Amino acid sequence: MKILSVFFLALFFIIFNKESLAEKTNKGTGSGVSSKKKNKKGSGEPLIDVHDLISDMIKKEEELVEVNKRKSKYKLATSVLAGLLGVVSTVLLGGVGLVLYNTEKGRHPFKIGSSDPADNANPDADSESNGEPNADPQVTAQDVTPEQPQGDDNNLVSGPEH
């Protein structure tokens, strides 16, 4: 720590001596006017180069335009990706809903349509697809009246509902 503080003190004195020497040389010329003031009054050239500043401003403006173009391309790409992500998530949610609905009903998870096997095996639809006219079968009394249970008359309800 002591070595470091000695180093910085020496550096400070060197810098301080350079500044004091520069002041002494300016005072030693006898005019007492600094060189900056001479440039202002003596010549018509400005201290700041305006042409360099303007060219730097133009370069910065061109860089900003390029950055904005890149940003617009990225913005378009992110908008497209967001749209695609929305479509994919909608399809996935629909698929999950279909699977949950079908498993609740006891069907195959990806089945779409009616779950009644009688609807799927409709003989009328087969005859219509063959081009044959649909002949209405005559309804008999046996088809309309329910069958009476045979045997015990007290047991009117039958089936797995007991």
Curated annotation (Swiss-Prot):
Annotated keywords: Malaria, Signal
- What would be one Pfam family of this protein? CRA
Leader sequence range is 1-16
Disulfide connectivity? Answer: none
Stretches the record annotates as Disordered:
24-44, 109-162
What are the Low complexity biased-composition ranges? 114-130
Which portions of the chain have biased composition (kind: Polar residues)? 137-162
Asked whether the keyword Signal is assigned, the reply is yes
Q: What else is known?
A: Although there are no authentic repeats in this antigen, there are a number of internal homologies (N-A-N-P) and (N-A-D-P), the first of these tetramers is the dominant repeat found in the CSP of P.falciparum and reacts with antibodies against CRA. It is possible that immune responses to CRA may act against the CSP also. The CRA is found in many parasitic strains.
Protein's name according to its UniProt entry: Circumsporozoite protein-related antigen
